Amino acid sequence: MAGAGGGLGVWGNLVLLGLCSWTGARAPAPNPGRNLTVETQTTSSISLSWEVPDGLDSQNSNYWVQCTGDGGTTETRNTTATNVTVDGLGPGSLYTCSVWVEKDGVNSSVGTVTTATAPNPVRNLRVEAQTNSSIALTWEVPDGPDPQNSTYGVEYTGDGGRAGTRSTAHTNITVDGLEPGCLYAFSMWVGKNGINSSRETRNATTAHNPVRNLRVEAQTTSSISLSWEVPDGTDPQNSTYCVQCTGDGGRTETRNTTDTRVTVDGLGPGSLYTCSVWVEKDGVNSSVEIVTSATAPNPVRNLTVEAQTNSSIALTWEVPDGPDPQNSTYGVEYTGDGGRAGTRSTAHTNITVDRLEPGCLYVFSVWVGKNGINSSRETRNATTAPNPVRNLHMETQTNSSIALCWEVPDGPYPQDYTYWVEYTGDGGGTETRNTTNTSVTAERLEPGTLYTFSVWAEKNGARGSRQNVSISTVPNAVTSLSKQDWTNSTIALRWTAPQGPGQSSYSYWVSWVREGMTDPRTQSTSGTDITLKELEAGSLYHLTVWAERNEVRGYNSTLTAATAPNEVTDLQNETQTKNSVMLWWKAPGDPHSQLYVYWVQWASKGHPRRGQDPQANWVNQTSRTNETWYKVEALEPGTLYNFTVWAERNDVASSTQSLCASTYPDTVTITSCVSTSAGYGVNLIWSCPQGGYEAFELEVGGQRGSQDRSSCGEAVSVLGLGPARSYPATITTIWDGMKVVSHSVVCHTESAGVIAGAFVGILLFLILVGLLIFFLKRRNKKKQQKPELRDLVFSSPGDIPAEDFADHVRKNERDSNCGFADEYQQLSLVGHSQSQMVASASENNAKNRYRNVLPYDWSRVPLKPIHEEPGSDYINASFMPGLWSPQEFIATQGPLPQTVGDFWRLVWEQQSHTLVMLTNCMEAGRVKCEHYWPLDSQPCTHGHLRVTLVGEEVMENWTVRELLLLQVEEQKTLSVRQFHYQAWPDHGVPSSPDTLLAFWRMLRQWLDQTMEGGPPIVHCSAGVGRTGTLIALDVLLRQLQSEGLLGPFSFVRKMRESRPLMVQTEAQYVFLHQCILRFLQQSAQAPAEKEVPYEDVENLIYENVAAIQAHKLEV
């Protein structure tokens, strides 16, 4: 009856029937169960429980449960237990459950309870949205019957403990009022008929609050650094911050971080970016905070200081790498070392920052600005140019240095300046110096050279504008300043141009001031000589010569020189004796004549007995006096003297006044007067008088006659006397128109031989007349003869006796030196055919100064050869003959620059102690000889030889130098004396023989004292002209002294056989004779070997005529 599947309606009907039909005695119905309770409900079951009815024996008892849904469905169950679960129900349905007890077929009353099954849970519960304070949930209605009248319940619990419940009739709900960033557990159920479904749960997190204070911390060319503060609300632990930057070109970079700062890199330079930042936790993002920023542009490239002035600095740069620099702005910031600062901007890639302080260091920063963001800065230090130096001027100048000074430039910071000095000479070449001082001395400059100086200040590499000044060094002093000539109103000076460049462009100034005066006079000249005129006679002048170039005066060379006094006047001999001559003259009319010294010089012009006294000294004698008269004493009787008088002051002599005067002859002594054998005459013998005499006059008894000079000491017969008589006899000595009568002697004649004497007298008379006619005709014939034309055959003069040399010179001087020309012509071809192969070799060409002056092979002086140096044994030098040796001298050319070393090798190898130099290094603007000795004490080295100047003595016409030659390898020395004659022009002759003779005497004295060592080395320029003349003069004067002979022609020919062109010009050949003649005039010594005195033809004629007349008188 109560089987499964039975419906409640049937049961009800049955119950009702039972109740209504219960008529018999039936068992009592059990009590209904007590406390019927719904224990649980599910979506498909309802669990009920109840208590056993009162008094019911549970044995054989059965409980019926019938649940009828609101949809009409019924489920029935029975059980013996006091609980039951009715399943198979529909979810979410309202059921009426009836429970009764049936025992023994008897049902108790029904206990009823209305309840419902639980609805199905909601479907597809999901979080629809989350904010920082709410979570939106949605779901779908549960499976099952119509959800009408259903209620949805939501319960949530946050991780911070916050909880709550919400309900809704909809399928979505937004739970708000939540804490941000919190995890919430949501439980969702459906409530219907008072029964809730099982819960659907979801966890959901509220979004965080947005980050706070989002800002851009930094921007670089490839990154943007952002920072923010944690959101308000809950602890952001386990939260992630998301950053997304999107550029204006669409490029996006995203970064996640748990920190509150991030650097987004990998961005493009100079680009605008929109950066979004949000918080993410449990997959929930907060709202986005946005900031717009830009990356920094790349820095400018190649920032360069383009120009600097004293008030501005120009900068240039290149646009930065990266996107188009349009809309970029360039900023420039500068700070000066004085604190001055400023900022400029430009849209260009260059800028000039002006109004700056001069000479200041500025730090420049340049950046690119784009989108309000500046690039990193490029910096450059640059200094404005200092102002130009002030008051640039020359402080001092020498021949090798110029000292400049200046004032610091205007400006606020003159310290730490470096000053640069650049100078260029007019010969080219530039030097640069720098200094931190306001002065500098430029050294090692060329003398007499114009230099252009540029001076500028520099600071930190910035140069100020230049200040320029042109200044010349001081020219060197002129050298070899000497007095060449002088008169009573002029002084001629000569000098050598200063050492240094540009000699041709020098001008020279001469200043002179007379003694006692203070106002000098000056005169300029472009040459190296000058003659000062209109000077006072007999006055001392202080002379100063300097070179000038570029308007700068050179160093002074000074000389004290005097004009000659005027010559004395009215020179006369007042009285004379046989041993003295009294001279008298008038003093010159000069202002200083009271200070004059007068010199009297006398020399014998000879007398017939001169050759008989080899011990006599006929050299000029000189004496001085302060008076205008002088008695010359200790003279030789009967001698013709040449007297010369001149005034002197300051060692300068006036022109001379001369006269010739003879001393009276000496008286003779009649030593014998004997009668002839016939008694018609006497034989007189008288002594020869001392000194000179020309003839004698005899007077015997009033009878007079003449005898020649040779009659003294011989018996002279005086005839025509009467026998046996006494006659007074005197002898008159005749000399130069003067007569001196001897003491009278009485002679006695014998009485025999008158007739014989007369005959002999007549015969002698006729003979003498014949001789007289012969000599007179011969003399007239010689006078009438005219000179004949010379033919081509010349007679070569041999050695000439000293006493004939004057005549020889006078004869050759006739017709414009025609005789000398003949002799010199004969010398022209001497030696030309000899070999000169060594000198002509190609390796030796450069060693020859002149191509036509080459040494002969046989006479050249060879040097010791140097290994593997062809031609090293050659020098243009020749051995020359002398008086005693074929190699008494060495003649050589003046050294060339390339042969100076060879020259000193020659000196060393020949061990020569003597050098004779007859040229100046520079003559007429041309180099004649290299300056081969040191200029000062600093030695010069040539190969293995070192030359040192030990001493120097400068005289008017020559200089003597002491040199020391050191062989470095052998450590041996050689002393050398150089005699440098400076008054002999090339191809010419000195103005007077006197200076050369004085030079020769000094040289010969040295050579006589220095016998050891090699031959003297003599040179001029070519080594033939002046060199040959001096060698010939030395040899011939020594020949004169030793032999009394002179052979100029022979010796010159002999020299030319050893070296070509010796005595190079006819003028030098004539001058050689003039020097010898002058030497003879200065010397009274006769050669010892000569006994026969010199007599010219006219004197011989005179003496013969005088003899004839004397014999005529005798007759």
From Swiss-Prot:
Q: Which residues form the signal peptide?
A: 1-27
Instruction: State the Gene3D superfamilies in the record.
Output: Cytochrome c1, transmembrane anchor, C-terminal (1.20.5.100), Immunoglobulins (2.60.40.10), Protein tyrosine phosphatase superfamily (3.90.190.10)
| Positions in the Cytoplasmic compartment | 776-1115
* Entries under InterPro entries matching the protein: FN3_dom (IPR003961), FN3_sf (IPR036116), Ig-like_fold (IPR013783), Prot-tyrosine_phosphatase-like (IPR029021), PTP_cat (IPR000242), RTP_Phos/Ushers (IPR050713), Tyr_Pase_AS (IPR016130), Tyr_Pase_cat (IPR003595)
Q: Which GO terms describe its biological process?
A: apoptotic process; axon guidance; protein dephosphorylation; signal transduction
Q: Which residues are glycosylated?
A: N35, N83, N172, N256, N285, N350, N434, N468, N556, N642
Q: In which tissues is it expressed?
A: Expressed at high levels in the brain, spleen and liver and at lower levels in the heart and stomach. Expressed in pancreatic and colorectal cancer cells, but not in normal pancreas or colon. Expression in hepatocellular carcinoma is related to the differentiation status of the tumor and expression is inversely related to tumor aggressiveness.
State what induces this protein: Induced at the early stage of hepatocellular carcinoma and is suppressed at later stages.
* Location of the Tyrosine-protein phosphatase domain: 820-1079
> What is its membrane topology?
Single-pass type I membrane protein
Q: In the record, what terms sit under GO molecular function?
A: cadherin binding; protein tyrosine phosphatase activity; transmembrane receptor protein tyrosine phosphatase activity
From the UniProt record, list the reaction(s) this protein catalyses. Answer: O-phospho-L-tyrosyl-[protein] + H2O = L-tyrosyl-[protein] + phosphate
| UniProt subcellular location | Cell projection, Microvillus membrane; Apical cell membrane; Cytoplasm
Q: According to its UniProt record, which protein family does this protein belong to?
A: Belongs to the protein-tyrosine phosphatase family. Receptor class 3 subfamily.
Assembly information from the UniProt record: Homodimer; disulfide-linked. Interacts with LCK. Interacts (phosphorylated form) with GRB2 (via SH2 domain). Interacts (phosphorylated form) with FYN (via SH2 domain). Interacts (via extracellular domain) with CEACAM20 (via extracellular domain); the interaction dephosphorylates CEACAM20.
The record's function comment reads: Protein phosphatase that may contribute to contact inhibition of cell growth and motility by mediating the dephosphorylation of focal adhesion-associated substrates and thus negatively regulating integrin-promoted signaling processes. Induces apoptotic cell death by at least two distinct mechanisms: inhibition of cell survival signaling mediated by PI 3-kinase, Akt, and ILK and activation of a caspase-dependent proapoptotic pathway. Inhibits the basal activity of LCK and its activation in response to TCR stimulation and TCR-induced activation of MAP kinase and surface expression of CD69.
Q: What protein am I looking at?
A: Receptor-type tyrosine-protein phosphatase H
> What species does this protein belong to?
Homo sapiens (Human)
